[in-house]
């Protein structure tokens, strides 16, 4: 199957909501080498986001059940084994994506926009690994996530408008990283607020084609700020991810 056919099959799989098939197609497209078009890049991102998202959601449910079965040994053991099975799947998916990023995507990116997109993606998938990691392994993974986000952030500040949806999406996820993974609510709020304020100040630079994406992410930044600065704590903070492209 040539590249065009793989892309068409990925689009078909997306419509059928068969995201594992979609990811497999886009993985093959990526492994052919060369720089991905914006459309191909977005197809790859959507495919893996859905594939990993299903496991992250399952992991949260099973972890919660496991905690509630304390005292019921058999049930707890079954929950633990199932959680570990989901974790193994999640790790495999994340490592797949990180391998594609390091081997092909980041190296082949010629435009600042693409570089930021892929470095953000690298930060995201290390963050997903960090959610299920523990001990020394977690420290290492968290460091990798932070470095990728910071590298992307530095490029975005000099090369992209504050209203660019990729720059805004990066700020959104980097702030979620500070809140959820590093437990630094002050840093998370400062980052989200700065991104929101900088975008508001330059609303006139908002291009027509990215208007919808940018304003959606700005809304998510504001929602997270409201959530984080209130007394409500908890997993709802993760809603910030809804606005990724």
From Swiss-Prot:
Pfam families: 14-3-3 (PF00244). InterPro entries: 14-3-3, 14-3-3_CS, 14-3-3_dom_sf, 14-3-3_domain. GO terms for biological process: protein localization; regulation of ERK1 and ERK2 cascade; signal transduction. PROSITE patterns: 1433_1, 1433_2. CDD domains: 14-3-3_beta_zeta. Present in all adult tissues examined with the highest levels in the brain. The record marks 56, 127 as: Interaction with phosphoserine on interacting protein. It comes from the Eukaryota. It is found in: Cytoplasm. Adapter protein implicated in the regulation of a large spectrum of both general and specialized signaling pathways. Binds to a large number of partners, usually by recognition of a phosphoserine or phosphothreonine motif. Binding generally results in the modulation of the activity of the binding partner. This is 14-3-3 protein zeta. It comes from Xenopus laevis. The lineage of its organism: Eukaryota, Metazoa, Chordata, Craniata, Vertebrata. The gene is ywhaz.
